[in-house]
Amino acid sequence: MPDMANVESFDLDHTKVKAPYVRLAGVKTTPKGDQISKYDLRFLQPNQGAIDPAAIHTLEHLLAGYMRDHLEGVVDVSPMGCRTGMYMAVIGEPDEQGVMKAFEAALKDTAGHDQPIPGVSELECGNYRDHDLAAARQHARDVLDQGLKVQETILLER
């Protein structure tokens, strides 16, 4: 069996990072020379909790729009499988401070969101019944109350 490709997040020492934070997880260059940056938008300390599936699903729907409102070039905002945060792909290489400010603004929008959740119908969503706006808003408030920071990448010592 061939070796599996290296996955950046498996090299991160999850015991040494301090959530909540924004972290540049990597930059890829496309064959045409464009840069795509991946950011780790961490809500919870790894291995010390997880966001409920309905809440993280709602965060995904809200941050998909709100991050685009505050940061140019957002390609995608998706939940981490561990449910402690989101990954965001963005065209170019925005600086971490700018991403942090955009994330903070998007979290403020999320915390104050008092309208229907966007994209929540059988036509628009693959699991449209699984949402929790109140919990999503609370997670946004919790991160804002704790304060965001830029987290450096701390690699495992192997």
From Swiss-Prot:
Residue ranges that the Swiss-Prot or TrEMBL entry lists as coiled coil: none
Pfam families xrefs: LuxS
Keyword list, A-Z: Autoinducer synthesis, Iron, Lyase, Metal-binding, Quorum sensing
GO molecular function per UniProt: iron ion binding; S-ribosylhomocysteine lyase activity
Catalysed reactions, semicolon-separated: S-(5-deoxy-D-ribos-5-yl)-L-homocysteine = (S)-4,5-dihydroxypentane-2,3-dione + L-homocysteine
Annotated NCBIfam families: PRK02260.1-4, PRK02260.2-4
Record-given protein name: S-ribosylhomocysteine lyase
